[in-house]
């Protein structure tokens, strides 16, 4: 009844959209003053009204009386009903990807495969909303002041994006589902035909507190958001595989497919070089081979997970497999630049497991020169434990470690560096990230390799609460030019 009344008011007021935040509210928009983790949306009613919001919905009586503020008993139910009224459309095929590492890669490869197969597709996640329509990309990313800040958007944002994608004829969409997003019910009643679990290792324990709770948050995707006859795709190399398999098949009743050893797709052989990889795999008793200019063995697993997702939302494997060789590297994921006989790589590796994987891979590709690693610590991400582990990993697997600033947020960057240096005493400390890159490039000689980890594609850096424009690959190119090393490329 509450929803029906509000929808009638929405019609009368000619409300066409839902304000994502009070700060972004505009005329002809409705704003939901939702309860939050630390503050209630009522704290922002004045801001929303000042910015022109036509209607405010809340579940708590505000201190001040307003003519266009309505109090409801079940604000979540009302919000869902309003969302269904304003943003009713969905793309025909939806898949979701969760996991500690690999989410961005899988959704991007899924989108690429669909596009190569001549279908309109999109990916949603850490890189923002990506389609081949630049105007649509701009429209759908305008509310994300920092595209990399939230892997999984709010429910309202997600429904708006899905509605716009469907309206623009995009039928295939892959979405990253983070543990935070799942735990905070950001996907609510959104259903997926298939979902994947890429990897699982320590992360976000500042939020989840225990590994069991972290795993439960990931599994929530399969429990609540995959349709009853849907498909789950899992990486067989996950240590907790038996628990995940049992939950997905026995408890949730989903069909399970897997990649890697003894999987539905078995990877027989991967020959890697600094120029790419040659892959031999087996699927449905047939052997296939392909080559890609993508570096990192883990990316082969991610590509084949994307393949299984695509096959299970209607694509013919015989059509997709020949297209695998056309897949392109993802920005900020083992992104390479060569100068002379040296290589620099920019990678998003934010976890000890991801860092170890990348460093081990690079060492196997070239053991003739030094392996130099630049990284720092980020704010509040399982803070000390993560920084310590990454310091240990970098020291063990690199010939030289340079500890620099990453995204300290409101923390003291010097204190973060100190925590890392305690377990990496032989590391070089260079606070300015750009200067750290310049120093590393200046000392590199033939066959040396440089890994710049932790920021990947990101275009901003947060230091002491201040946001500055910054990108690792741009810094690499800048200093190569300044040091006259670019000419050897």
Where are these regions (language model features)?
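Short acidic-hydrophobic, aromatic-tinged amphipathic segments that line or gate anion-handling sites
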Residues: 69-74, 258, 428-432, 436
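Phosphate-binding loop of NTP-binding sites
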Residues: 79-236, 240-253, 304, 310-313, ...
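Acidic, Mg2+-coordinating active-site environments of NTP-dependent enzymes
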Residues: 58, 62-66, 183, 192-344, ...
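N-terminal leader/targeting and accessory segments in enzymes
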Residues: 1-81, 85, 239, 268-270, ...
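ATP-dependent carboxylate-amine ligase
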Residues: 1-13, 24-30, 40-43, 108, ...
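Short glycine-/acidic-enriched loop or helix-start segments at secondary-structure transitions
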Residues: 41-44, 49, 66-68, 81, ...
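Short, high-confidence coil segments that cap the C-terminus of an alpha-helix
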Residues: 53, 168-171, 367-368, 447
């Amino acid at each position: 009844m509450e929803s029906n009344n509000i929808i009638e008011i929405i019609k009368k007021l000619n409300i066409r959209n839902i304000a994502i935040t009070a700060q972004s509210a505009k005329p002809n928009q409705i704003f939901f003053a939702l309860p939050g983790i630390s503050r209630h949306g009522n704290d922002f009613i004045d801001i929303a009204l000042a910015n022109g919001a036509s209607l405010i919905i809340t579940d708590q009586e505000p201190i001040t009386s307003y003519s266009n503020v309505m109090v409801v008993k079940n604000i979540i139910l009302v919000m869902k009903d309003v969302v269904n009224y304003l943003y009713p459309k969905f793309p025909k095929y939806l898949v979701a990807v969760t996991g500690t590492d690999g989410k961005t890669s899988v959704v991007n490869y899924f989108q690429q495969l669909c596009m190569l197969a001549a279908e309109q597709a999109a990916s949603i996640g850490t890189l923002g909303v990506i389609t081949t329509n630049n105007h649509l990309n701009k429209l759908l990313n305008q509310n994300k002041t920092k595209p990399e800040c939230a892997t999984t958007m709010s429910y309202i944002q997600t429904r708006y994006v899905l509605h716009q994608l469907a309206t623009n004829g995009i039928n295939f969409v892959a979405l990253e589902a983070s543990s935070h997003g799942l735990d905070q019910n950001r996907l609510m009643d959104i259903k997926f035909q298939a979902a994947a679990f890429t990897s699982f290792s320590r992360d976000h324990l500042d939020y989840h507190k225990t590994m069991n709770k972290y795993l439960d948050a990931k599994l929530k995707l399969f429990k609540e958001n995959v349709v009853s006859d849907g498909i789950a795709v899992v990486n067989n190399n996950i240590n907790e595989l038996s628990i995940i398999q049992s939950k997905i098949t026995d408890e949730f009743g989903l069909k399970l497919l897997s990649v890697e050893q003894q999987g539905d797709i078995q990877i027989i052989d991967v020959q890697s070089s600094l120029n790419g990889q040659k892959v031999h795999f087996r699927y449905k008793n047939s052997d296939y081979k392909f080559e890609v200019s993508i570096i990192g063995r883990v990316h082969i697993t991610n590509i084949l997970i994307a393949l299984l997702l695509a096959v299970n939302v209607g694509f013919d494997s015989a059509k997709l497999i020949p297209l695998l060789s056309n897949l392109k590297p993802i920005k900020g994921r083992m992104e390479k630049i060569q100068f002379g006989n040296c290589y620099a790589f920019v990678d998003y590796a934010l976890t000890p497991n991801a860092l170890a994987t990348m460093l081990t891979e690079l060492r196997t590709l070239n053991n003739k020169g030094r392996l130099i690693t630049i990284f720092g610590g980020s704010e509040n991400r399982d803070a000390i434990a993560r920084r310590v582990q990454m310091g240990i990993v970098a020291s063990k697997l690199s010939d030289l470690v340079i500890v620099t600033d990453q995204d300290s947020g409101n923390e003291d960057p010097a204190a973060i560096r100190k925590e890392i240096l305690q377990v990496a005493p032989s590391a070089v400390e260079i606070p300015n990230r750009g200067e750290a890159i310049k120093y590393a490039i200046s000392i590199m000689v033939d066959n040396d390799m440089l890994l710049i980890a932790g920021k990947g594609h990101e275009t901003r850096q947060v230091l002491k609460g201040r946001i500055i424009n910054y990108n690792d690959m741009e810094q690499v190119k800048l200093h190569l030019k300044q040091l006259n090393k670019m000419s050897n490329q």
